[in-house]
Amino acid sequence: MSRFFTTGSDSESESSLSGEELVTKPVGGNYGKQPLLLSEDEEDTKRVVRSAKDKRFEELTNLIRTIRNAMKIRDVTKCLEEFELLGKAYGKAKSIVDKEGVPRFYIRILADLEDYLNELWEDKEGKKKMNKNNAKALSTLRQKIRKYNRDFESHITSYKQNPEQSADEDAEKNEEDSEGSSDEDEDEDGVSAATFLKKKSEAPSGESRKFLKKMDDEDEDSEDSEDDEDWDTGSTSSDSDSEEEEGKQTALASRFLKKAPTTDEDKKAAEKKREDKAKKKHDRKSKRLDEEEEDNEGGEWERVRGGVPLVKEKPKMFAKGTEITHAVVIKKLNEILQARGKKGTDRAAQIELLQLLVQIAAENNLGEGVIVKIKFNIIASLYDYNPNLATYMKPEMWGKCLDCINELMDILFANPNIFVGENILEESENLHNADQPLRVRGCILTLVERMDEEFTKIMQNTDPHSQEYVEHLKDEAQVCAIIERVQRYLEEKGTTEEVCRIYLLRILHTYYKFDYKAHQRQLTPPEGSSKSEQDQAENEGEDSAVLMERLCKYIYAKDRTDRIRTCAILCHIYHHALHSRWYQARDLMLMSHLQDNIQHADPPVQILYNRTMVQLGICAFRQGLTKDAHNALLDIQSSGRAKELLGQGLLLRSLQERNQEQEKVERRRQVPFHLHINLELLECVYLVSAMLLEIPYMAAHESDARRRMISKQFHHQLRVGERQPLLGPPESMREHVVAASKAMKMGDWKTCHSFIINEKMNGKVWDLFPEADKVRTMLVRKIQEESLRTYLFTYSSVYDSISMETLSDMFELDLPTVHSIISKMIINEELMASLDQPTQTVVMHRTEPTAQQNLALQLAEKLGSLVENNERVFDHKQGTYGGYFRDQKDGYRKNEGYMRRGGYRQQQSQTAY
């Protein structure tokens, strides 16, 4: 008989505690017979029948809960995996959603996830700290969620307009379902614990009812006991369940399931509790409605922090009635400085105290010496405001710093009797005795050098494409003005070493700037300019070239440190190259011998050297010296790390090779954006120079199997272009150069010219040069000349003779130029021909082998090498080296082998005998 038709009593299902576990005591008669009476299906555990809606929604809520946990720990990879599973689960529940509508918790997770991803995307610092997998998952998930949310746009919009209402509706629904349950906490997915437990407790099992019977009072009504008996007889018995499951069920039932009110007092208390909850709910709704009405009627509201703002009183520096003297002020200054650098010190308050101390000293006429000393400490405190080296100064602090340095310089220029220096000890300071020169410990040069470093950090940490960068760049005029003032001060009172240091600062702010006014004066002859223009030019001061010459020569003569002299030489060369003074720049580079030992310099100097070499190569290209330009740019471009070597950014592949600290150090060495060299212009100059050198060389050595490559990068671009199955019109700069190279191979200079010089290339490259028209004219002439050389190399075997006038017309070159080019080729033995002066023709000598002969020669050479390799392998297998014994045995190629192996064979024969 099935267990569903058996009746059991309370004694049959009583449980007893064994150790710490709650175990059901089985009946003796049924225990042994149960495996024989029950079928396989009846031995299965009890199943809870749920609807399809509950199953699908539970699957969705579990996935949502996992996503929210991943969001809390910023695990974007886990979010991506669970979001894909969530989409699949939602697809399975589509039929239910079409009937019931989209669940509110699903809309909430979509909106929250999209906002969360947008916050992560905008957090630049956080993105940098992400690992590779999370960063990739963030980009992928952001695209997927934006695409996925388009189908739920209306639901998400309504949710975002009133998210609180959606949450309240869910809360009300859960409160009604729970009917006064003590646990009102709603989880993140809108399903409360009370609702969950109520569903479970609507049809309790027999064991749980029995357990609750024992916990209830014994004075229950007879109807309740009869109902319990009916439940006992009518419910399914759990005798076949494991002891562990029974223990868990009884424990959960006793902990979570509610008890029915047994007395009138309990019923009244429950009723009162429900009334209180309904009243609280009504109060919340009315309060929210009142607030909304006030918001609509009262206009705009202003958000304040912590109520009425209090007027901040100035801190009291001295007690009332204290006499302000030099000693008192210096003592107070030392007290303030003692807290400097300590943990918990308010740096902003410390700066305010020092500024207040300056005002007190000025009001009491304590002298300029005390004010200068306090000013030095204010500037030092401004620099120490950010303890982290990588953090740049805030705009307000930066403005205070510039103003304070200017005020300090005003005082020093107005009072020549004040001497400042690092070598002055605090014991020997003279701050108030006017009979002697005032002496203050401090170094104005160190403050200015730190100011320059802070300016560089500000420019490094500002978005170069924003208006903020332009505003910060305007501050460079103030920085340069301060450097000039300090330069004038140190020229009068500073040492030679200090003058060299301030000169270098001035050079570093001058060398990269193109002097347009001096350039215009060079283009305009002095006779054509009026007298007023000449007077204006004289009043403007010296040109940047004259200034650089004066400052650098002083450093060359007076400096005792290699670093300052090296930086000055490199800046001087850069400035010469920038203004197209090629020969001065080249001679200075060769005489300095910097290329021999630059690898021992520190990284910032190496970056400056790389920038100088690049500018030198661009200068040579503007002058039409393509070979010099190619040689100067070869090291930078062949490495494939031009961006990193020039200090203009870090490569992604190199970021994996260094840790976070090394990356921070590398970023601090980067050059600000306004000092950058255009990398596309640099690559274009290099590739065009390589094209003008490589294409004629390839045509001249076409049959040479061992020809060397002048530029590996140029050959790589040619191979990439040849691999493309379909060739459309060129778009990028590299494609333009490759297409021009193919045209030059055929001697078609016009097509080559159209690919190199056009509107697209003008906008990207050629218009960026100061003298763009001059550069374009030079390029056209170079293309014509090298195309002529390529044509003669390629088709010399076709002609017996060719007229120079014909060549002049083909390449649109004047006759003397054609004559000069051909003469150089004949003299250098590049072209086997002779010039017939009366007829102005080039007579070919035909000493070069034809194409068929070249192929035959190559085949013969390869066959010869193959025979030698086979003989060597055979000798190695036979154990004889040099083939002597084999040749003696059967005379196989005896003479030829002897002649070919020569001395080695003879030496072996001597040792054998």
From Swiss-Prot:
It comes from the Eukaryota. SMART domains: PINT. The modification N6-acetyllysine is found at K99, K643. GO terms for biological process: formation of cytoplasmic translation initiation complex; positive regulation of mRNA binding; positive regulation of translation; translational initiation. InterPro entries: EIF3C (IPR027516), EIF3C_N_dom (IPR008905), PCI_dom (IPR000717), WH-like_DNA-bd_sf (IPR036388), WH_DNA-bd_sf (IPR036390). Residues 1-44, 157-301, 522-542, 885-913 are annotated as: Disordered. PROSITE patterns: PCI. Residues 199-216, 261-278, 886-899 have a biased composition (Basic and acidic residues). GO terms for molecular function: ribosome binding; RNA binding; translation initiation factor activity; translation initiation factor binding. It is found in: Cytoplasm. The modification Phosphoserine is found at S9, S11, S13, S15, S16, S18, S39, S166, S178, S181, S182, S909. The keyword Cytoplasm applies. Residues 166-190, 217-232 have a biased composition (Acidic residues). GO terms for cellular component: cytosol; eukaryotic 43S preinitiation complex; eukaryotic 48S preinitiation complex; eukaryotic translation initiation factor 3 complex. Phosphorylated. Phosphorylation is enhanced upon serum stimulation. Keywords: Acetylation, Cytoplasm, Initiation factor, Phosphoprotein, Protein biosynthesis. The modification Phosphothreonine is found at T524. HAMAP family: eIF3c. Component of the eukaryotic translation initiation factor 3 (eIF-3) complex, which is required for several steps in the initiation of protein synthesis. The eIF-3 complex associates with the 40S ribosome and facilitates the recruitment of eIF-1, eIF-1A, eIF-2:GTP:methionyl-tRNAi and eIF-5 to form the 43S pre-initiation complex (43S PIC). The eIF-3 complex stimulates mRNA recruitment to the 43S PIC and scanning of the mRNA for AUG recognition. Component of the eukaryotic translation initiation factor 3 (eIF-3) complex, which is composed of 13 subunits: EIF3A, EIF3B, EIF3C, EIF3D, EIF3E, EIF3F, EIF3G, EIF3H, EIF3I, EIF3J, EIF3K, EIF3L and EIF3M. The eIF-3 complex appears to include 3 stable modules: module A is composed of EIF3A, EIF3B, EIF3G and EIF3I; module B is composed of EIF3F, EIF3H, and EIF3M; and module C is composed of EIF3C, EIF3D, EIF3E, EIF3K and EIF3L. EIF3C of module C binds EIF3B of module A and EIF3H of module B, thereby linking the three modules. EIF3J is a labile subunit that binds to the eIF-3 complex via EIF3B. Belongs to the eIF-3 subunit C family. This is Eukaryotic translation initiation factor 3 subunit C. It comes from Homo sapiens (Human). The gene is EIF3C.
